[in-house]
Each structure stands twice: as C-alpha cells, then as structure tokens.
C-alpha cells in the first residue's frame, strides 16, 4: 500500500496534470480559432472548416493529452502514432475515410503551424513525407482492425 506521502504526491501530480491540461485546452481553443480563420481566408467552406477543426480537437485535446501534456508543436512528432495506432484503437468511428480525413486535417494544421513559425520547416517537411509514405500502411491497419474475420493479434502482435 502506498504511504500517505506517496498518495499525496500522486494527488499533487494528478492535480498538476489536470491544471496543465486545462491550460492546454484553452490554448488549443485559441489556436483552433486562428486555424479556422486561416482556412476561411484560404477559401475553404464552412463545412470543411468545421470538419478539420473537429478532427483537430480530437487530436489536440484527447490524443496529445492522453498520457502526457503535449503541445501542438510537440505533437508534430507523434502524428504517425496517432494515425497508425491510437486513432484506430480509440475512435470507434475509425475507418479508411476517417484516417484519410484526419491525415488531411493534420497536414493543413501543421502547414498553418509552419507558416506561423510555430514548428520548423523541416518538421513540416518530415510530417508530409511520413503521411505520404505511411498512409497506405495506416489504411491497411484500420481495414484489418475493423474486419471481424481478421485475428486481432495479426493486426497488432503482442
């Protein structure tokens, strides 16, 4: 059993985590507002903007805050993990279409981040290359994951 000091430390850590998440969610909301305006200025329609922002809200406020408190800039390194694994497992609506849509949303979002110099140009270039190279693998993974005839261990061996 954990000592009183250990339990207090865990509560403090949890409280710090919750406070950090709350702050990041506020920052993310402001960033998504800026992103939405950027998309509108680029000529995208309201439904498309809403779709991109919904996809990004899930990525920013669920995936990046799931086990850690990662900023959107930190998250550029985790897009592959999100699209190729986490999204497929955690989003009950995951399918080939939604993986492609999320890839497009993330690509646009990180283009916006790069334009604003919130990430380095080489990080954005690496992200685009990763999406280009890995998208077929991610689509295959989601197809296998959603196929009741496929053994789960064949998709993600333990």
Predicted regions and their residues:
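Charge-rich, intrinsically disordered N-terminal extensions
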Residues: 1-119, 125-158
